[in-house]
Amino acid sequence: MSLIRELLRAIRITLIFWLITAIIYPLAILVVGQGLFPYQANGSIMQNIEAQPIGSALIGQVFASEQYFHSRPSASRYSQGRRARPTGISGGSNLAPSNPALLNRIIEEANQLREENIQPIEDLIYSSGSGLDPHISIQAASQQIERVARARNVQPDEILRLMNKYTDGRFLWIFGEPGVNVLRLNYALDLQDFNNQQNR
């Protein structure tokens, strides 16, 4: 009899913990997230002026046009484009430093940057561990100002002002380095062009 009682008690405790961890806790987090942080809870999805999603401010993407700041290289190519690997996962290339394929990729990136008169700094030739970085360093963004200003036919000071506006500081003021959010900056450039055309 006591064995059955202990078994029923164990089942009851299991059901209570299942109810707490599988239903009550997730629902509480959902309500708090949607109530207090709806933008972040839904993936920080950015929309254009027509309310169409253009990407997440938390995940990098490819920008090939000369009018845009370019993101860091990605081993997964941000799951975009002809040579993308749409795996739905993040990650580096896992190529060893001695691997010729890695060296060839870096040399190719550096040569392409030199053709654009951009100094090949680390941020612009090395991919990150996640392969999905939404930010580039201030130095990497500064290297691209002239090219973007020329392509958009605006003064570099206008681009610099926007770049400073979309530079995120250190996390909790001490962790990491300041970085420029590439998607936010590129969309701000498009908005600026749109507003300039409307005012003409």
Swiss-Prot record:
Coiled-coil residue spans: none
State the superkingdom.
Bacteria
Transmembrane region(s): 13-33
Q: Where in the cell is it found?
A: Cell membrane
What membrane topology term does the record carry? Single-pass membrane protein
Q: Quick one: where is this thing mainly located?
A: membrane
Keywords of the record: ATP-binding, Cell membrane, Ion transport, Membrane, Nucleotide-binding, Potassium, Potassium transport, Transmembrane, Transmembrane helix, Transport
Family membership: Belongs to the KdpC family.
Subunit field text: The system is composed of three essential subunits: KdpA, KdpB and KdpC.
Q: Which HAMAP family match?
A: KdpC
Entry's PANTHER family? POTASSIUM-TRANSPORTING ATPASE C CHAIN (PTHR30042), POTASSIUM-TRANSPORTING ATPASE KDPC SUBUNIT (PTHR30042:SF2)
What is the purpose of this protein? Part of the high-affinity ATP-driven potassium transport (or Kdp) system, which catalyzes the hydrolysis of ATP coupled with the electrogenic transport of potassium into the cytoplasm. This subunit acts as a catalytic chaperone that increases the ATP-binding affinity of the ATP-hydrolyzing subunit KdpB by the formation of a transient KdpB/KdpC/ATP ternary complex.
Protein name (record): Potassium-transporting ATPase KdpC subunit
Instruction: Say which species the protein is native to.
Output: Anabaena sp. (strain L31)
Its taxonomic placement starts with: Bacteria, Bacillati, Cyanobacteriota, Cyanophyceae, Nostocales
From the UniProt record, report the name of the gene that encodes this protein: kdpC
